[in-house]
């Protein structure tokens, strides 16, 4: 036991984390805080432009210089294996938790040699990401299966946040897969934040305010939101769209909206989490068009704020939003129709349903599930079954 007070030192390694990244950064922060509160010693290792070693609410955060991955809009990776290996040797972890199955898969082999139990967290589906980049489905599935077999062999356990994310591992017969849903801050994200003044400011005189909270990159399909807005307006729905997020497609999307005369406001990355929650509460409907999402924290945050969400039928989000949202196939027309279907219900009804669904997903339950995957729970708590409503 390396941590203070008999807890475990859980070293977490993650790529694709920047000051402006969204769901993964939030999940790492909240899980780290939860591990600390449970008496463990979390250490997060991430890439950055300069080296640093700081203490934060989520525990110790070590930044190792890493190169920017071209075409990702600033994402960096832990490419210096020698330096990472030496850091792992120095930290002498009791557990490792890895949030990247590509360039960090080798750490599973390090853990096996060091006799350290290891967990890989699947934050995306390999075949889903490949398909969003234009790889034919059959070829994407074969490539994903090869990658996932190596991943399942390399790590003691694979953690998936939804049943949907598990499927590609079930397909290859992996038996070391466990499920651990993510959570949402139900105090920060709440319906009471809804402001008519803020809504009117962003709606700009339109009757319906749509919101997209997303990284503006290919795999997130942000263009679907613009096209759905155009479909709605062509059908006589007076709607406006606000986009909170940044990424490599931002310039192209701005030009597209301008050329088509669409009422779209691009806010860029909203760093203030309180301001983002205000925005999520002010919207009438949020859009989540990414077809490869394995959980969708921004969609869950919108639900917690009382705002229903239209999600891609190709993603895990139908499993997350349940009856509190609407599911659409990956076409602008389908997303527009789903928006109209949600708006047809009384506002009070749809907002209560959204909040009720979000209340199923607490960070306390998430932390417990992740610690269970690490065999890091007290014996009595480890035997406690997962709540049925989370498993569904």
Region locations from a protein language model:
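Nucleotide-activated donor-binding/catalytic signature segment of Leloir-type glycosyltransferases, i.e.
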Residues: 251-270
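Conserved donor-binding/catalytic core segment of Leloir-type glycosyltransferases
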Residues: 11, 203-230
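Conserved acidic donor-binding segment of nucleotide-sugar-dependent glycosyltransferases
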Residues: 323-333, 340-346
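Nucleotide-sugar donor phosphate/pyrophosphate-binding loop at the beta->alpha transition
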Residues: 79, 117, 128-150
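Short hydrophobic beta-strand element within catalytic cores of glycosyltransferases
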Residues: 308-311
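Donor nucleotide-sugar binding/catalytic pocket of nucleotide-sugar-dependent glycosyltransferases
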Residues: 46, 62-65, 141, 145-194, ...
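Aromatic "clamp/platform" in nucleotide-sugar-dependent glycosyltransferases that forms part
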Residues: 291
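Short alpha-helical donor nucleotide-sugar binding micro-motif in glycosyltransferases
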Residues: 152, 269, 277-283
